[in-house]
Amino acid sequence: MTTPNKTPPGADPKQLERTATVREIGSQAVWSLSSCKPGFGVDQLRDDNLETYWQSDGSQPHLVNIQFRRKTTVKTLCIYADYKSDESYTPSKISVRVGNNFHNLQEIRQLELVEPSGWIHVPLTDNHKKPTRTFMIQIAVLANHQNGRDTHMRQIKIYTPVEESSIGKFPRCTTIDFMMYRSIR
């Protein structure tokens, strides 16, 4: 059982993108849900609007399935939850699983959330801080606050590390022979 990374209240994952060390890759995946109320599905979960949400409609566990076309490196999962707005619909226990498909998913994180308000940053790294490579991520809501039945999740973002490009990173020319060719006339 782990506790998610503590971030300042309202720490927007877009701040991660501004560091140019990660980029959001949710649009490259196929998203599916175990259930949803009409008008409260994947579109609301991915619309960048914190006022909209996915609402499940069925028995627990409630599942969000995220499938990539190729094996993908994932570093961080960000979930927006708001206990003040959602009360008993707010998740209190979440499991994050990864694998090649539905049949070989393995749990890599289980989170206990206590009245969350804002972005929850979940590292998807191994013990050596190395990002996970996977075809599929599954987020399972195992329990809600106040023993609520259905759940609300307002947003989910998935981030991959940005690989440094070698373009523009040439060794310094220090010898006389190299310095002769360092500029174009």
Curated annotation (Swiss-Prot):
Any Pfam family hit: ANAPC10
The keyword Acetylation is annotated on this UniProt entry: yes
Annotated pathway: Protein modification; protein ubiquitination
PROSITE patterns: DOC
Modification N6-acetyllysine occurs at: K169
GO cellular component terms, semicolon-separated: anaphase-promoting complex; cytoplasm
Domain DOC stretches: 2-185
One BP term from GO: protein K48-linked ubiquitination
CDD domains assigned to the protein according to its UniProt record, in alphabetical order: APC10
Keywords assigned: Acetylation, Cell cycle, Cell division, Mitosis, Ubl conjugation pathway
Positions of post-translational N-acetylthreonine modification: T2
Family stated for the protein in its record: Belongs to the APC10 family.
Function, in words: Component of the anaphase promoting complex/cyclosome (APC/C), a cell cycle-regulated E3 ubiquitin ligase that controls progression through mitosis and the G1 phase of the cell cycle. The APC/C complex acts by mediating ubiquitination and subsequent degradation of target proteins: it mainly mediates the formation of 'Lys-11'-linked polyubiquitin chains and, to a lower extent, the formation of 'Lys-48'- and 'Lys-63'-linked polyubiquitin chains. The APC/C complex catalyzes assembly of branched 'Lys-11'-/'Lys-48'-linked branched ubiquitin chains on target proteins.
PANTHER family named in the record: ANAPHASE-PROMOTING COMPLEX 10 (PTHR12936), ANAPHASE-PROMOTING COMPLEX SUBUNIT 10 (PTHR12936:SF0)
Subunit structure: The mammalian APC/C is composed at least of 14 distinct subunits ANAPC1, ANAPC2, CDC27/APC3, ANAPC4, ANAPC5, CDC16/APC6, ANAPC7, CDC23/APC8, ANAPC10, ANAPC11, CDC26/APC12, ANAPC13, ANAPC15 and ANAPC16 that assemble into a complex of at least 19 chains with a combined molecular mass of around 1.2 MDa; APC/C interacts with FZR1 and FBXO5. The C-terminus of APC10 binds to CDC27/APC3. Interacts with PIWIL1; interaction only takes place when PIWIL1 binds piRNA. Interacts with FBXO43; the interaction is direct.
Protein name: Anaphase-promoting complex subunit 10
Gene: Anapc10
